[in-house]
Every structure is written in structure tokens, then in C-alpha cells.
From Swiss-Prot:
GO terms for cellular component: NADH dehydrogenase complex; plasma membrane. The chain crosses the membrane at residues 5-25, 31-51, 65-85. It comes from Rhizobium leguminosarum bv. trifolii (strain WSM2304). It catalyses: a quinone + NADH + 5 H(+)(in) = a quinol + NAD(+) + 4 H(+)(out). Signal peptide: none annotated. This is NADH-quinone oxidoreductase subunit K. One of its GO terms (molecular function) is NADH:ubiquinone reductase (non-electrogenic) activity. GO terms for biological process: ATP synthesis coupled electron transport. NDH-1 shuttles electrons from NADH, via FMN and iron-sulfur (Fe-S) centers, to quinones in the respiratory chain. The immediate electron acceptor for the enzyme in this species is believed to be ubiquinone. Couples the redox reaction to proton translocation (for every two electrons transferred, four hydrogen ions are translocated across the cytoplasmic membrane), and thus conserves the redox energy in a proton gradient. It is an enzyme of class 7 (translocase).
Length: 102
């Protein structure tokens, strides 16, 4: 059995759906929201690499590496902001984020 493009697209669609459900079903926890966004970005990367391989083009794979780099930076900055917010407020609830106004 050969793993074809449809298998990669199915896995990507499942990951994307899980990410969207994670955002909509759990709006109270910032960490779960960040993890759901990372799942969505991973699904996009799988699509990029699958179509790049299917079309014999390297541009999609290079762009997927760029997206991974930006996603890693986004996760690091988001978690750093979350740690500072927890130290100041003692909670990471989404409802308390509106208190961050300057």
C-alpha cells in the first residue's frame, strides 16, 4: 500500500479540525488555545509539504520550514507573556487578560 496525497490531506484535515475544536471548546485556558493554534499550523505545514512533494516542487517545503520557525517564535513569545502574566495576576484565565491594558 502506497501512502498517497489523500492520506496526508486526511491527517491534515483531522489535525486542523482538532485545533479548531480546541479553540472553540476550551476558551478559558490560554495554554490550550496556544496548543490548538500550533495544531492548526502543523496541519497547514503537512498540506504544504504534501502538495510540494506531489508537484515535485521544493518551494512548499521551504515555506513550511519558514512557518515552523515563525510558529516556534510565536510559541516562545506567547509562553513568556503567559509566565509574566501568571506572576503578576496569579491566574492564566482568558477573562483576566483584559486587565493588561496600559
Amino acid at each position: 500500500m502506497v501512502i498517497g496525497l489523500s492520506h496526508y490531506l486526511t491527517v491534515s484535515a483531522i489535525l486542523f479540525t482538532l485545533g479548531v475544536f480546541g479553540i472553540f471548546l476550551n476558551r478559558k485556558n490560554v495554554i490550550v488555545i496556544l496548543m490548538s493554534v500550533e495544531l492548526i499550523l502543523l496541519a497547514v505545514n503537512i498540506n504544504m509539504v504534501a502538495f510540494s512533494s506531489f508537484l515535485n516542487d521544493i518551494v512548499g517545503q521551504v515555506f513550511a520550514l519558514f512557518i515552523l520557525t515563525v510558529a516556534a517564535a510565536e510559541a516562545a513569545i506567547g509562553l513568556a507573556i503567559l509566565v509574566v502574566f501568571y506572576r503578576n495576576r496569579g491566574s492564566i484565565a482568558v477573562e483576566d487578560v483584559n486587565m493588561m491594558k496600559g
